[in-house]
């Protein structure tokens, strides 16, 4: 879910009439792990597939927030007009595949889908075998 990773505690009083403004402390593209611990009053702009930064416990979709114009990238802010609940729009690691499940059986020809799935599971290397070439010569 593309949006802002937030601390639910910062948004307890957020409403249409009492919006909360948060400083955007970092931007997290897909596949990137955060090195910053989200502090009170901060949010992180996060893309689908990125790991939730430490300190964040929910995501507010971009469609439910307002990005304020800024001149300096260190001064980016967002306005949120509703309270958020714990784990809103957050999918836990491994939630889509059970531990120990076979995701690519031996002998299967790997597709782009398989490689994306393996990458999303943190599999960086896969042992593969070459399809054998066989020729039959009939001699009589």
How would you describe each model-predicted region?
Residues 1:
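Polyanion/phosphate-binding surface patch
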Residues 4-140:
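Short, glycine/charged-enriched hinge/interface segments at domain edges or termini
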């Amino acid at each position: 879910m593309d949006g802002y990773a937030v601390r639910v505690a910062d948004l307890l009083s957020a409403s249409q009439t009492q919006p909360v403004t948060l400083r955007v402390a970092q931007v997290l593209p897909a596949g990137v792990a955060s090195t910053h611990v989200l502090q009170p009053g901060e949010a992180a702009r996060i893309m689908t597939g990125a790991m939730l930064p430490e300190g964040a416990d929910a995501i507010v979709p971009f469609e439910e927030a307002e990005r304020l114009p800024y001149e300096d990238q260190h001064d980016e802010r967002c306005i949120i007009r509703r309270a958020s609940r714990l784990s809103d729009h957050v999918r836990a690691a491994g939630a889509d595949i059970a531990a120990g499940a076979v995701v690519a059986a031996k002998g299967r020809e790997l597709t782009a889908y398989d490689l994306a799935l393996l990458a999303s599971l943190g599999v960086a290397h896969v042992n593969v075998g070459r399809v054998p070439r066989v020729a039959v010569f009939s001699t009589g």
